[in-house]
């Protein structure tokens, strides 16, 4: 059963090639980072919570030659603003933010 550890072995650290903030509502601005293959299959990384944020380690679980790795900080989390805000911060808002980010990129 030595194959399982090989499958879980992360890829080397990878710098983001694009990052910024996207205004998704009058109140909220989400932070995002893009790395990997610019023409690759999109892989959207959704971090845990509550209050967490994207971490560089998360992108290590995707092959950067195959995937365009997109990470973002959900409303109220990480480098998104306003920090720790619960206003207009529901699952429906999260889905809408992901769609807005997809269209932007």
What are these regions (language model features)?
Residues 6-10, 56-59:
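Intrinsically disordered, low-complexity boundary segments flanking structured domains
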Residues 7-31:
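N-terminal cap/lid segment of alpha/beta-hydrolase-fold proteins
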Residues 21, 47-49, 87-91:
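Short, flexible loop segments at the rims of nucleotide/cofactor-binding pockets, characterized by
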Residues 24-82:
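Conserved HGGG/HGGXW glycine-rich cap/lid loop of the alpha/beta-hydrolase fold
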Residues 61-62, 86, 102:
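Structural motif
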Residues 81-95:
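Catalytic nucleophile-loop/oxyanion-hole region of alpha/beta-hydrolase
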Residues 92-105:
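Conserved acidic catalytic loop of the alpha/beta-hydrolase fold
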């Amino acid at each position: 059963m030595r194959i399982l550890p090989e499958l879980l072995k992360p890829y080397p650290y990878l710098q983001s090639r694009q990052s910024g903030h996207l205004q998704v509502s009058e109140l909220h601005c989400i932070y995002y980072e893009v790395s990997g293959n610019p023409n690759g299959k999109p892989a959207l990384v959704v971090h845990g919570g509550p209050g967490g944020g994207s971490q560089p380690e998360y992108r290590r679980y995707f092959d950067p030659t195959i995937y365009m790795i997109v990470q973002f900080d959900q409303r109220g989390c990480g480098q998104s603003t306003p920090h720790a805000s619960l206003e207009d911060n529901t699952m429906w808002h999260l889905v809408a933010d992901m769609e807005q980010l997809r269209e932007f990129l």
